[in-house]
């Protein structure tokens, strides 16, 4: 599949990869691969007019996760990634996802248009205990996290925050959690079951380069009241929490988004052309 041909005919759908044929065949976005097969590994990012942020980091995370879960050989993973990158469209806004099937061990590319992007986020703060089975790897728990987000949506929220049984905040269902305590950028302890987020890592590195103190802290939802809190991921970038919703429980007050705009502008500047 050549890059030129793919750009001219890019449509939403799923492409399966094999060493001999490369990427072939596409089914509808709404279908379920391999009779509802669970994903062993997944990774995704925003692609805007052929530009992407931190693609090399997504590659590293995906290849490492595939290796940790007994996936294809490194050579096959590298070849898949090359073919996948060549197949990405260079016009429009997309949210592609790379996948490794849990049973079939099949490598796939899901091409889908990006949903509307947000600059702020309403968060369900009822305290959703973390339901994941493999929290440090993206893929196995996407379905259950999707159900968590659906529940949050019924409460008028865009996202839900996961907590430990003892009430410590972890991350969003689809995003990393960061917050500010005075001039310190904070995030959950690495000892807690959180996913290593690409966007979160970029933000932490910028903070360290510019002299902003970064600290790992254990906090409950109540501790985040009146603080500037960000949910960050590869799709939306930085979204400050604009409202905490909690159904019948008392609502937390959202802090002002004092720093978010400047950091969002910096993050947007990291978009680079596909190689």
Q: Where do the model's predicted regions map?
A:
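Glycine- and Gly-Pro-enriched alpha-helical subdomains that act as flexible
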Residues: 168-190
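Conserved alpha/beta cores of soluble small-molecule-handling proteins
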Residues: 1-161, 165-166, 200, 205-275
